[in-house]
Amino acid sequence: MTDYRGEQVVIIGLGLTGLSCVDFLRRRGVTPRVMDTRFTPPGLEKLPADVPRHLGSLHEQWLLDATLIVTSPGVPLSHPALAEAAAAGVAIIGDIELFAREASAPVVAITGSNGKSTVTCMVGEMAAAAGWQVGVGGNIGLPALTLLDSPCQLYVLELSSFQLETTHSLKAAAATVLNISEDHMNRYPLGLQQYRAAKLKIYHDAAVCVVNAEDALTLPVRGHDARCISFGAERGDYCLRRHAGQTWLMARGEPLLEGAELRVGGRHNYTNALAALALSDALGIPSAASLAALRQFRGLTHRFELVHERRGVRWINDSKATNVGSTEAALNGLEVVGTLHLLLGGDGKSADFTPLTPWLQGDRVQLYCFGQDGAQLASLCPEAATLTETLEQAMRIIGSRVRAGDLVLLSPASASLDQFSNFEVRGDVFTRLAREVG
């Protein structure tokens, strides 16, 4: 255990993660200072009264007086106040670094532009099916530090690029970068390679690296090495194969599971399952338990979720598709008898939308574009696009047009914060309207 007594610690950002950092440090004899750029951040009412706090801005002098800053992933390291503190020699870390210094059980670490929550939950359920005591959290569910409160045989962490930027001591038993596509480009002014560099930190000191055989950007900096196990739809140690008209999940040439046995739809979920199997095998989870867990896995809300079906029309909520790569994954292998009604829109985070263009061709695709970057998305295929201000307006138009055999897909390729408080609310609005107009 690291001794933090004597450190002058500042925590930036409250919420569940910030509170977990406060609790972690107080139990180790340190009362940190807390600051948040919001005047009423979530969790403020739970902050102990004796903890000094500064709200509404970053307190630059507190940062310069600190010996250790534990910052929220939401605050970029390029923020002038943080950059000044770093230049003055103040150590800057995040909650995952605090966790990594303390965790005694093996850690499986999962990142990627898309699919990381699904794979994290799959691996967690595989371990649970084997009877292991497992803690699942990080960028999903519980903050990582909260997981230390219960005895665990395995930790399964979803990690974002922002979290990895401030993590230096993680030694994962198995780690994966599922895929890399443009996301958060407003946070990475140097472009995709800067974003990738943050993701690849997950491999530092990892015992096993699970890489995407069809995405070279997921390879470690030095390329494919002895630590690497690969997965992919068409190739890899874990891949898909057609046999007798059915798709099978394979491991090194051995058939493991027929795709039709999975309860989650979409080709992208087959590859998510392959990545989870590669990780579980690397961790020594018994194969029978892993396969049983996959057969029972029902998927996560707002992730390619069938929320309504009536009169031959399916309505799928993929609101978590907050970037182009995630929407491409949803469209890949999608089978539609009639017309695909695709809802796109929101805050594109300075992303390039043009990779979507090949998926939008043909007379059986209709686009409905809304929100901050709706016009830019509509320009990808103007002859098939309907531009509206809001998701609700688009849904009511769709409701008047759909016919049996059609599929309505909300897979926005954009963040939700221009019009919604989060992607969950956006998905809930879609679901409510689907049941109303469908």
Swiss-Prot record:
One Pfam family per UniProt: Mur_ligase_C
Keyword ATP-binding: yes
Family: Belongs to the MurCDEF family.
Pathway recorded for this protein: Cell wall biogenesis; peptidoglycan biosynthesis
Protein name, as recorded: UDP-N-acetylmuramoylalanine--D-glutamate ligase
Protein source organism: Sodalis glossinidius (strain morsitans)
EC number: 6.3.2.9
Keywords, comma-separated and alphabetical: ATP-binding, Cell cycle, Cell division, Cell shape, Cell wall biogenesis/degradation, Cytoplasm, Ligase, Nucleotide-binding, Peptidoglycan synthesis
